[in-house]
Amino acid sequence: MCGGCKWQHIGYETQLQYKQQQVTDTLQRIGKVQMPAVQPILGSPSQTYYRNKLEFTFSFMGWLTEEQIKDETAQYDRRVLGFHTPARFDKIIDINHCWLQPDPSNQIRLAIRDYARENMLRFGNIIKQTGLLRN
């Protein structure tokens, strides 16, 4: 699971409560901001395809899932365009379908990834800061 969907196993109303608490805690504890009474967070009317901005990262060595690692017969193109795994800046999961942003986002991302693969463009190496395509 990528970092984008890390909240999806929790009910939406609970997600909103946690996210509001996270923002409030950050402003008070780190920012030392004296907070007035905070109104409840306004949620999206939709629980999928509600994001208007996402940032994807290219990687020449995509992160494999446990299922992919166990499948010894499969060959995977490790050049990926996706999201960071949770808590890792250097591990990128290839995303075939993202539930956070509406189409044509998925089609555009996949077309760009496939074009880069077909035209042998150099995918980024996050550790070495090399490669034509990064994020």
Residue ranges and their predicted role:
Residues 1-135:
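Accessory RNA-recognition modules of RNA-modification enzymes
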